[in-house]
Amino acid sequence: MPHRTAEVRLLDHGYSREARSLLYHAYRHDPTFAYLFESERPGFDQRVRATVRELVQQHFAEELPAIGLLIEERLVGIALIAPPIRRLDITESWSWRLRMLMTTGFRCTKRYLEYHDAVLACLPPGPYHVLPLIGVHPEFQGQSLGEQLLTALHNWCAEDSGSQGVVLDTGNPHYLEFYKRQGYEEIGEVAVGPIIEHVF
């Protein structure tokens, strides 16, 4: 597919609806989400949609940064960024936990929180930017937009002299080599049910 260049833009809550739609499509086939939100049980799509909605709404409500890629004003890629001093706030919010319990159920919320805590436990000491959600819309994958999104993200995070880097994770083996080509080094592995989540 041809390489396309997208406009890089810092996003605010006005992009919440587009962000939720994009991230839902990016994560609905993710093996980690399939385990966390029980893809074998009816209602899986609704649980993924609800989780993405709650994460995105809380992210923008706390005025945390997000970088987007736009082509002809359509959001095609996004990275939600949790700066070093704020990265734990979302899952520690009781209102967020309550909304998750009501929309995804106790077992899925518990699984998600355990996964989140296990990933954060892999972080080395020091301040890092963490990416709770990152994705390129499936219709636009294979066009080097993932590379463009990560470059924009790295440039933005580099402006914070107090940060030692960016941390992300994936349980999708398809993305392992991609992240390594972008210069990421694996710092840990987390067992998420039958899935091995790689932390970079």
What is each residue range found by the language model?
Residues E62-A79:
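Conserved beta-hairpin
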Residues P132-Q141, V167-E177, G193-P194:
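Conserved beta-strand-loop-alpha-helix junction that forms the acyl-donor binding cleft
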Residues V167, E185-V199:
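Conserved catalytic-core motifs of GNAT/GCN5-like acyltransferases
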Residues V136, G142-N155, R181:
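Conserved acetyl-CoA-binding loop-helix of GNAT-fold acetyltransferases
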Residues E147, E159-S163, G171-E189:
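Conserved active-site alpha-helix within GNAT-family acetyltransferase domains
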Residues L75-G135, Q141:
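Conserved acyl-donor/pantetheine-binding loop and adjacent beta-alpha core of acyl/acetyltransferases
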Residues E7-H25, H29-T32:
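A short beta-loop-alpha structural element at the N-terminal edge
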Residues R41-P65:
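Active-site rim helix/loop that mediates acceptor-substrate recognition in acyltransferases
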